Amino acid sequence: GNFETIFPMMREDGFGAVELHLWDSREIDRKKLDNELKKNSLTLTSIGTGGAYGTWHLNIADHDKDIRKKAIECLKEHMITASPYEGVIIIGSMQGRFKDAGSPEEFVNNVEESLDILDRMAQEYGVYIGYELMNHYESDFLFRIEDGIRFLNEHSYKRTGIHIDTVHMNVD
């Protein structure tokens, strides 16, 4: 639904924050979003990005550099939207699958390269990246919390952390 309908309902139900699931942040009126959040005493905590993978197959691991570039641009637009709230940009489905990269090794290399770029952007926009650990039915990489922590500890990301979704954790 639209912000004008959903946000008052959320406020009335006692919510103080919202996670939006957006395909493309350029398609929303950011000023209107901000006004509606303020009017309803809400803040934006995070943006879920999986729709861009499901709809356009944008992902940060793809063998095709142009697809990775478009995925990073899409995520940058979400950072601009989340910036006033120091929000989290959740990368779940947009991490892609091994088949998108061509091999597990290329997948990991492309994810690391993309996260390096995105982490620097997150610093610039004052937001955070939440790398979502997903279950083995929906992801090929990092299913368990300890694996995600190990992966992050191998890198020097400043604004990237693990996003833990209990739906996925209950599977693995």
Sequence positions of predicted segments:
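Active-site acidic/histidine proton-transfer and metal-coordination neighborhood
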Residues: 61-161, 171
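A cross-domain feature marking catalytic cores of carbohydrate-active enzymes
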Residues: 20-24, 46-51, 91-94, 131-135, ...
